[in-house]
Amino acid sequence: MEDREISRAVIGRLPRYYRYLGELLDAGVERISSNDLSKKMHVTASQIRQDLNNFGGFGQQGYGYNVKYLYTEIGKILGLNRPHNMIIIGAGNLGQALANYASFEKNGFILKGLFDVNSRLEGVAIRGVPIRMMDELKDFVSQSDIEIAALTIPKSKAIEVAEMLIENGIRAIWNFAHTDLNLPEDIIVENVHLSDSLMRLSYTISRYQEDHGK
């Protein structure tokens, strides 16, 4: 693959390809055409071919795609061929829900620590990982091989905690705090606003009702 910039739109579609290909594997499907894959994913076949051509193509004329091979290769592109140790800061409802999501570990995201300020949660184990207090966070991060930190904390604390994590070697932050984090360019940040998708759904409902007179 050429060393060139891949658009965020293409990268954003890769997890969908990976997920659908995993479903096909589970169903025992060995190969699939771009046309059949497009029907399943509700994108055009040409879009699929263009996306995959960014990484070398993977398909054969008249054969389509080998599902297992394509699944494996997209997994490599997404970095899922090696484990990623992660911690969650904030063990409230959202933090615990993330910790309980077993598919993360299936894809190589290994939960190593949970942290919170609520002393009543200290020692409570989520899938075998005990909740620790925030005053342990700095030492834990500096002494552990942690790659990703998920923030499920109030936005008023997000910058302070993010800066401390960066000072202690964290280079990737999955941010669920209700604010966008603007951090140094060498820090990888994925800002997630759960309400955004709900607002898009609300917009679609409103347009549908207007178009159909409801």
Regions found by a protein language model. Give the residues of each.
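Extreme N-terminal segment that seeds HTH/winged-HTH DNA-binding domains in transcriptional regulators
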Residues: 1-30
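Phosphate-bearing ligand-interacting subdomains
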Residues: 22-25, 128-214
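HTH-adjacent hinge/linker in prokaryotic transcriptional regulators
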Residues: 31, 35, 40-83
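Glycine-rich Rossmann-fold phosphate-binding loop(s) that bind the pyrophosphate
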Residues: 91-92
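N-terminal Rossmann-fold NAD(P) dinucleotide-binding loop
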Residues: 95
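NAD(P)-binding Rossmann-fold cofactor-contacting core
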Residues: 105-127
